[in-house]
Amino acid sequence: MNAIMKEQFAAYPVETAMILGVAGGNGLEHIRTNKYRRVYGVDINSAYLDAVRERYPQLSGVLQCLHLDLLNEAEQLLQAQLVIANLLIEYIGYPAFQKAVLQINPEYVSCVIQINTDVEQWVSDSPYLHAFDRLDEVHHQMEEAVLSAAMQEIGYAEILRSTTVSLPNGKALVRIDYQKTRLHVQQSSYH
């Protein structure tokens, strides 16, 4: 995931980015302060955001952490040119993700989703498996075509689909990037 984030931060000619579900901040070391004016790290967990601030003091002039619940507070999201959402859509669902993207109004959206070929067991075997017992209540099975259709509905076209990285238990990570379509840019500039 770290290497993927490095690619995501470098991929597009942007100065602002928003990371939805920043968690503990893995991959933020790839933020180049000579490229980015502002990077927003969004998470529902304030302890994660505190850890990010402590872990990356060198980004204090660029990185701004936002404690928000994307399901209920998407209207508080600020605008950015790039949205990065890695392993997040599985937990908030397509409609909430669409709402967040529309609010942020980026030129580019870069997502990593986990594709599960074994639907019955989407959490990896671990001695701590019981800790995930209720995760089924918030986890949404991801499908590449459904995500791309959801993005197309809100005016974004797929521009990149990375090689799938195979993981244990029949899982894979897939990076899919989108760009705002020209028609959508023209329509949104009139509102």
Each predicted region: which residue ranges?
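Conserved alpha-helix/loop element of class I SAM-dependent methyltransferases that forms part
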Residues: 1-15, 26, 30
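Class I SAM-dependent methyltransferase SAM/SAH-binding core
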Residues: 16-72
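Short conserved loop adjoining the S-adenosyl-L-methionine
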Residues: 72-78
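A short SAM/SAH-binding and catalytic strip from SAM-dependent methyltransferases
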Residues: 81-95
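Short, glycine-/aromatic-enriched active-site segment of Class I SAM-dependent methyltransferases
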Residues: 116-138
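Short alpha-helix
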Residues: 135-155
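Core SAM-dependent methyltransferase catalytic element
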Residues: 161-191
